[in-house]
Amino acid sequence: MSRFFATNYNYDETSSSSEEDLLSSSEELLSSSEEGELSDDSLFNDESESESDFDSDDSDAKPYGPDWFKKPEFRKGGNKFLKGASYSDSDESDEEDGKKVVKSAREKLLDEMQAVYDKIETAEMSDDWMTILNEFDSITRLLVRAQQQNFGIPKIFVKVVAQVEDLVSNSEQTEIKNKAVSKAFNTTKQRVKKIARENEALLAKFREDPQSFDKEDTVEPELPPLNEENKVFTGKGVNLSSLASASSEFSFMASLQIVNDSRGKKNSNQAELIKTLEELLNIAKTPYERILAYLTLIPTRLEESTNLSYQPIDQWKSTHDDLNKLFDILDENISSYQVTELAARNDDLETEPEPNANGIREILGSLLSFTERLDDEFKKSLLNIDPHSSDYLERLRDEQNMYNLLLRTQLYMEATIPEERQEQLLARAFVRRLDHIYYKSNKLISIIENSAWKAVPSSYKSKYIPFSGNADEEYCSQLVEGLSKSLANQDNVFLQKRATLSHIYYTALNGEFEVAKELLLKTKVQSNINKSDPSLQILFNRVVVQLGLSAFKLCKIEECHQILNELLASSHLREILGQQSLQRIASNSSSSSSSEDREKQCLPYHQHINLDLVDLVFMTSSLLIEIPQMTAYLTGIKTKKVPVYQKSVRRLVESFDKSFFHGPPESIKEHVLYAAKSMQKGDWKGCLEYLKSVKTWNLLPNSVEVLDNLTERIQIETMKTYVFTYRRFYEKISIKKFSELFSLPEDKIVTTMEKVIADLELNIKLDDNKTYIVIEKGDEVSKLEEVAVKLNKEIRATRERLNPSHHNHR
């Protein structure tokens, strides 16, 4: 049975669990009332529930129906005959007077869930899937509230999941004609599938016997037998809530041992364990006792949220604070006690470990594992919170606290671990630290580093990446390079590749394109990347995109186009960059895939690369490369035919030319298209204006500088397009006129035209003084002749179609 079904009160096995036994045996009723009232109608599996109150109108009514003796009215009426019952006529009169009943938070939550159940039942009659979806989302949020308040999983929630699951399975989408309702149906189907998978055991139990699901008895969890010292706690089980309060007569270590033995048990109550450990911390006398208490409390807090999608934020902060308090104790007693993974196991908690040669008592524990788990829970929360809400920004503020803890853990390990084992054991801390900074600019890294070093004790120093007091640009570069090199020396291939890719990403992001490119080619990390872990493949794809953006910032258009071309040809760009939502992955993945595997396939929203910016950069590069080449090819110049890609500008232009009605540009794609049409006309100013009007450029940190560099390239490519298009109308063109028309220096025009003539073997040359472009007439067909030939072919085809017999006779 799941631990959510555990109760905290003692249960007498002699008392009957069925309602019919209540009717037949007054002795059992008496024994039941003496042992403690047992609620069969409890909707929660982990707590007992008192009988619900009823209005006087209902209580006066006569019970009816075949199971009338099971009605609450019958049981309430019978209570006044029990020993010790406080039922009286005055109670009835109080209820008749209409006194307000104050409900607990749990009862209010149950009422809200019951209201959801009723609304879904009503919506079922009219197939109102939009209401069903809204109410299902509501009860999902209520479940989170219930679990955050340690109420467990209410049975009414299981009922609603089963109810919606049955509705989905009994309905067919083909019968739904309304598009909005059909969309709501699909969304409901996906969400209920995911939640049903997470609560599979409870649903199976409900479907096995729905009627007795609410009335199932709960059993007190079995605890290990107590020794002679523990005989202060007698009876059928140990009440953990009174454990710490009895510590004046019951030793701290014995209490801690009982808590440790209770952890991981089937019916153990995590909330009570945490409360007990917090009370034990208040009475702990020695540093050794406080260290042991924290080493038990921290993992217990983490275990409490095992079945949740992420640890609730208030619990996460409590765990974070506990870990910092543990570090405070360890820092104060660093010469006496140290927590390390290299210590020997000590089965006897009451006996402190023997001091080593340096007089230090080593306690077995992994502080880094606690920090890693907190970091995982932090990432999970970011993946599950709506990235467009204020909650996400609020949660993101905790990243600084998380990074402070990572740095503190690393520095403590450097101070306590033998030098020969440091680099191996610190690798996990290095990769976590690198994961938090590799995608940030130097300015952001400087802020987070300065804040982190201020938060850790000043006595700590790092020999791997020394901190001089100010995280300037040079320090940030040395930090990423130092962490990457240290990880590259590890035997673990995964860590080696991840460190290398993170280093390349950081280098490209901060404007060093050539260095990043050489590093990628030198390490050959791209070989066999398809066989690597999914998270590595995602990081590699991110590196490729960042390299393309870095090349574009430096106006290396050809290299940018070449780098991004293959990646943007994919129809699943969001997926291969790890930028799809966790919920979408869960709905599309098979039931066999674990939540950990799904989390590897996506990144928190603040780490995403803006796909609109990537599209804009690629299409702009495509515009500058393809429009001149396409114009040259279509005007009869012998040149290599431009291949057509999915997002190439040539495809957009061809589609645009086939349409008749053209509105003003709205999307990024349309702005680039209109810029291409302006370039074809030789209007470089219009081309630049259309590109500059796209607001997505503001996402580049140096957007003004990038657009200024782009201006000259647009002028040159527009000039080349103009020459290819209109050369048949000229015998010679003045360089000075071109300089005025395209706002380019004359020497730049001469250099460009010399290169074009050499590459394409045009019948064009410069005069001796290089003041004119002389165009030699060749055999090329003029535009008018092209239209005439085309029209002649169409006339002939039409004539043959209208007079087939005349054509055959001839």
UniProtKB/Swiss-Prot annotation:
The keyword Protein biosynthesis applies. InterPro entries: EIF3C, EIF3C_N_dom, PCI_dom. One of its GO terms (biological process) is formation of cytoplasmic translation initiation complex. One of its GO terms (cellular component) is cytoplasmic stress granule. Its main location: cytoplasm. Residues 12-33 have a biased composition (Low complexity). Residues 1-11 have a biased composition (Polar residues). Residues 34-58 have a biased composition (Acidic residues). SMART domains: PINT (SM00088). It comes from the Eukaryota. Keywords: Cytoplasm, Initiation factor, Protein biosynthesis. Residues 605-780 form the PCI domain. Residues 1-98 are annotated as: Disordered. GO terms for molecular function: RNA binding; translation initiation factor activity; translation initiation factor binding. Pfam families: eIF-3c_N (PF05470), PCI (PF01399). It is found in: Cytoplasm. Coiled coil: none annotated. Component of the eukaryotic translation initiation factor 3 (eIF-3) complex. Belongs to the eIF-3 subunit C family. Component of the eukaryotic translation initiation factor 3 (eIF-3) complex, which is involved in protein synthesis of a specialized repertoire of mRNAs and, together with other initiation factors, stimulates binding of mRNA and methionyl-tRNAi to the 40S ribosome. The eIF-3 complex specifically targets and initiates translation of a subset of mRNAs involved in cell proliferation. This is Eukaryotic translation initiation factor 3 subunit C. It comes from Candida glabrata (strain ATCC 2001 / BCRC 20586 / JCM 3761 / NBRC 0622 / NRRL Y-65 / CBS 138). The gene is NIP1.
